[in-house]
């Protein structure tokens, strides 16, 4: 049936509307899950702060890991933050060590650690300047409970999720980091962790080209029964990783925009990485930048999907971003009216045309051919 449906011709506009609707569904479901999980964790701090802490790396012995090599290539198209990560990945575990792990042999590596019967292996990394992406295998000797894989996926979303509890650097509270991927069986989960680093690369092209990323995991948890946060299974342990990510600055494209709206909101510039695009927005004095929402549309006027929940990074995966349109809207107006209102005019206007009459400030930017 799915193959037959894929053969039915549909317009690009309808195809894009369906994709945008599914992206919205994913975002709503993730927000609900985050609320449930944060309640269970006793209140969490900002996700982007929790992993940049100094750790001692203690290599551990590993059990047999059935799927560990080339994880980016296997799952980069199935998760919500899609990207060509395999084209830019830094391999942490060489093929020789991967073969040993898959054969059940002992590997002494800082990227493979076991605690309380759960092995965590970090096999690949890529750093875009806007985020760090880690390819991970998580293996439980005793098998994960059914709730981990039965409650964490739907046909609409198409991927599964595990959550990592990590200590927040300043407060000591736990924060939750989401790993998206799939369960290969009841014992093994493979996925990609995305950690936001917005601000590390600036619109003038300056920034951090290399990063030492520290990840300390105190517990691993999955999904529990709907509405029963206290029943979410949780595995405590100690997994500490230090990973270096290197960025080829030639992959970063920046454009100075300096567009100012009537209310004083300013689009300073655009930053485009191999995976995402981000607009630097500045609020006028006395106004809160958090009260506005930035939308970026591709060269065809279609809205780009958000790459993350915690920042306004937009995915460029398989989209034409040689030219983009940027719109800064009032947050409440966009969330309460504009986002839902587009469906009424979608047959007449692109998303860019629709937003042009509502934006506090907007700009059209063309990236020069490389």
Language-model segments: residues:
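Disordered, charged N-terminal biogenesis/targeting segments of membrane/secreted proteins
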Residues: 1-35
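Alpha-helical, hydrophobic structural elements that either
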Residues: 18, 53-370
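Long, compositionally biased, charged low-complexity segments
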Residues: 25-38, 334, 347, 351-354
């Amino acid at each position: 049936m799915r193959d037959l449906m894929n053969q039915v011709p549909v317009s690009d506009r309808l195809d894009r509307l369906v994709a945008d609707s599914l992206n919205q569904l994913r975002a709503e479901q993730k927000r609900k899950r985050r609320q449930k999980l944060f309640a269970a964790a006793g209140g969490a701090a900002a996700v982007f702060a929790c992993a940049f802490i100094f750790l001692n790396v203690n290599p551990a012995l590993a059990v047999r890991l059935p799927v560990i090599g080339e994880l980016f290539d296997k799952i980069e198209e199935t998760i919500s933050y899609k990207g060509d990560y395999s084209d830019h990945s830094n391999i942490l575990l060489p093929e020789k060590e991967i073969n040993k792990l898959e054969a059940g042999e002992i590997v002494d590596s800082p990227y493979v650690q076991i605690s309380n019967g759960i092995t965590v292996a970090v096999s690949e990394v890529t750093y875009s300047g806007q985020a760090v992406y880690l390819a991970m295998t998580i293996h439980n000797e005793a098998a994960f409970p059914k709730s981990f894989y039965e409650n964490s996926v739907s046909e609409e979303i198409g991927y599964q999720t595990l959550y990592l509890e990590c200590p927040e650097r300043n407060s000591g509270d736990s924060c939750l980091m989401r790993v998206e991927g799939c369960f290969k069986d009841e014992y093994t989960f493979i996925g990609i962790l995305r950690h936001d680093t917005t601000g590390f690369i600036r619109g003038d092209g300056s920034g951090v080209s290399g990063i030492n990323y520290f990840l300390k995991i105190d517990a691993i948890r999955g999904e529990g029964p709907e509405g029963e946060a206290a029943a979410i299974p949780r595995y405590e342990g100690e997994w500490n990783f230090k990973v270096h990510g290197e960025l080829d600055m030639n992959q970063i494209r920046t454009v100075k925009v300096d567009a100012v709206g009537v209310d004083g909101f300013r689009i300073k510039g655009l930053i485009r990485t191999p995976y995402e695009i981000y607009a630097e927005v500045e609020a006028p004095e006395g106004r809160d930048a958090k009260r506005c929402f930035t939308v970026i549309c591709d060269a065809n006027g279609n809205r780009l999907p958000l790459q993350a929940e915690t920042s306004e990074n937009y995915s460029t995966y398989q989209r034409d971003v040689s030219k983009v349109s940027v719109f800064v809207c009032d947050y409440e107006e966009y969330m309460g009216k504009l986002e839902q209102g587009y469906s009424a005019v979608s047959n007449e206007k692109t998303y860019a045309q629709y937003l042009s009459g509502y934006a506090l400030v907007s700009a059209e930017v063309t990236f020069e051919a490389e």
